[in-house]
UniProtKB/Swiss-Prot annotation:
Annotated S-adenosyl-L-methionine binding sites: 283, 312, 317, 333, 360, 381
Residues of the TRAM domain: 20-78
InterPro entries: 23S_rRNA_MeTrfase_RlmD, MeTrfase_TrmA_AS, MeTrfase_TrmA_CS, NA-bd_OB-fold, SAM-dependent_MTases_sf, TRAM_dom, U5_MeTrfase_fam
Protein name: 23S rRNA (uracil(1939)-C(5))-methyltransferase RlmD
Residues of the active site: 407
Species name: Pseudomonas savastanoi pv. phaseolicola (strain 1448A / Race 6) (Pseudomonas syringae pv. phaseolicola (strain 1448A / Race 6))
Amino acid sequence: MAKHERGLRFQPAGGVKTVQIPAGKKQRLTIERLSDDGRGIAFLEGKTWFVAGSLAGEEVEARVLNARGKVVEARTERVFTASTMRRAPACEYFGRCGGCSVQHVPHEEQLALKQRMLAEQLLRVANVVPDEWAAPLSGAELAYRRRARVAVRWDAKAKRLDVGFRAAASQDIVSIEHCPVLVQALQPIMNELPGMLKNFSKPQALGHVELFSGVATAVLLRHTAPLAEADLALLQAFCSKHGAQLWLHGEGEPQPVSPGDTLGYRLEPWNLQLAWRPGDFIQVNAAVNTAMIEQALQWLAPAKDERVMDLFCGLGNFALPLAGLAREVVAVEGVATMVERAAVNAMSNDLHNVQFFQADLSQPLTHADWAAEGFSTVLLDPPRDGAFEVVRQIRKTGARRLLYVSCNPATLARDTVELISQGYRLKRAGILDMFPQTAHVEAMALFEMSK
């Protein structure tokens, strides 16, 4: 195998060697436009630069994070000529912390960027424009996140405990004591968490910390070795001060220190309460989650005699509100433990017309007993991979209306191609601003069978 000299990448014999740009190098650039993920795009000497923290039309100094072939990833270090659109970020750690990527962009422009990303994916991949664009669903720009994972790492060489969030494009930890996107109930906990953990007698036993806010506030500590009694007492005093439950995650499943403690969240418009456990999926933005459910019910508008299917149902986030409108809801999820908790949630909310089933949603739906009667309406809320295997079978269920909630416009567009081929029409679509200050796009799309 040929040796690789530092800074050079060699092509096979007879090819052309390409000079690679080392990480850390600074370069002055003119930003031409924004990419789909909110980074600025610049072109220089045959290479395309993706520059975090920049805006179209700006002159910036960028520091290289990574370079591969003709693509360079970088972050803004200095702005020589600022866009009139630029605003001061709300967070002092912006640009270093990897959590937020577009705090320098006004919120209305963030929404426009996300709308454009969705529209471009649908047009480019599926060659379709919805009959109607819905207004973006959004809530507060800041103080919206009710769940967060805080990275913790003991640096034995430096004898230092790092507590914070992962850096942008890196596994490094940015030490953080304040995060403006966390809900208010978690702010004082986050402010004092690093100082408390640094008093541990055995910091090398610390893994990570998760913070939760809902019906109750909770702190979960992942630990890789048994905790010293003094350290456990420190944790308990900290949680008591902040009125938070304490959960520990050593070997096995996470458990509350007080056996009676439980976690849950409210869906106030329907007077529902859903229980959940660490490891379960819940939407981190409570306000947008509620607005999303309200919009889904309005778009689907199931009649009282209809049978509705909810696929990738999780804990019943959509299924339980739907049960208040339809004759019957059949909800299907791949994770067995979440199916069990969803069924308990239905019973605890006195809902008896919703059934939950565990199934591999990559397999034919029509082979299952619960699918035998068919459905007039289907709701999908798949993971980022989308629901291609499911949508290939949707027409066999008899569904006239299908609501697709997506956390990835690329797979939504791909699945739209299949739905159109089956005779469905894209009636309405819009973005869900579940993660303000980031370029992450969630969307809702309504399909109806063409007449």
